[in-house]
Each structure stands twice: as structure tokens, then as C-alpha cells.
């Protein structure tokens, strides 16, 4: 099956591989003048860089029936179902910002309380220098939450 993508981004960051079927983000890239090319962060073949997940009572619930639209003809948004949950998602790379965000909104279709969790999971498998040919960059990769603004930081040294 050929994957359909919904690319987006801004003048700083490119999000070329947002999967229409799953809402998973396979990679993102940015221009690095010191490297004179694009630096691309990629997920693994078995687990993308970022993918929405949903759990109820300790059991994973698949995200299904995604329908997509573009807010302001640019920002990819979706509606989907995960078991008894209605899910809305949006991937935004605001103009002028050197980053992006993946926003999820979840509503229960059931009466009464639910015990569950949702968020993003993934694997930062590799970093690549991309000009005419892609070359993997060696280094130690770390993801952590910024103490300054609680953002997720991708750090490679």
C-alpha cells in the first residue's frame, strides 16, 4: 500500500511525512547553514517519530476513521475515533517559530468517568544530513522536557 502524506511546515521547519492513514509523523527537517543542507530527524520503520496513542483501562485503543481538512488552507487537522473516544488532532508549525506542535483533543462518547491516557509515542531512530544524497549523522540522541518552557527537546551531541 502506498502511504498518503499531508506535508506542512513553515519557514524554519518542514513536516513532509504526516501519514493520512494514522496521523503519525515519520520525520521532520530543518535547514542548517553550518551543515549547508537539511538536517532530517527520522523515526524507525516499525515505529514512527511521533504517533498518537490512546489507552483505556491499560489497553491500547487504535485510532481509526480519520478524516482530514486543512485549516486556513495550510494546517492539517483530523477527526477520528479511538474506541469510545472522539479525537481531534492538529499539527501546527506557526509562522516565525523554530518548532512545531502536535495538538490532540479527546472527548468521551460514554456517560461517566473513564480511566485512561493519551498522547504521543515514537522512536527517534536517526538523524540525516540531506543535500543531494542522504548521509546518516553519528551522535548520541536525547529527548527531554525543557525546564524553561516544558517543550519536548530533541538534542544530539
Language-model segments: residues:
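Terminal accessory carbohydrate-recognition/targeting modules of carbohydrate-active enzymes
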Residues: 1-157
Amino acid at each position: 500500500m502506498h502511504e498518503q502524506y499531508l506535508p506542512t511546515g513553515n519557514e524554519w521547519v518542514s513536516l513532509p511525512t504526516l501519514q493520512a492513514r494514522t496521523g503519525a509523523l515519520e520525520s521532520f527537517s530543518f535547514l542548517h547553514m553550518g551543515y549547508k543542507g537539511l538536517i532530517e530527524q527520522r523515526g524507525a520503520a516499525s515505529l514512527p517519530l511521533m504517533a498518537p496513542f490512546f489507552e483505556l483501562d491499560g489497553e491500547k485503543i487504535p485510532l481509526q476513521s480519520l478524516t482530514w481538512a486543512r485549516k486556513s488552507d495550510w494546517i492539517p487537522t483530523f477527526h477520528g475515533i479511538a474506541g469510545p473516544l472522539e479525537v481531534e488532532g492538529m499539527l501546527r508549525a506557526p509562522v516565525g517559530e523554530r518548532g512545531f506542535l502536535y495538538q490532540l483533543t479527546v472527548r468521551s462518547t460514554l456517560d461517566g468517568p473513564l480511566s485512561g491516557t493519551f498522547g504521543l509515542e515514537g522512536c527517534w531512530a536517526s538523524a540525516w544530513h540531506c543535500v543531494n544524497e542522504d548521509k546518516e549523522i553519528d551522535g548520541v540522541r536525547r529527548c527531554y522536557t525543557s525546564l524553561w518552557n516544558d517543550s519536548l527537546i530533541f538534542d544530539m551531541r
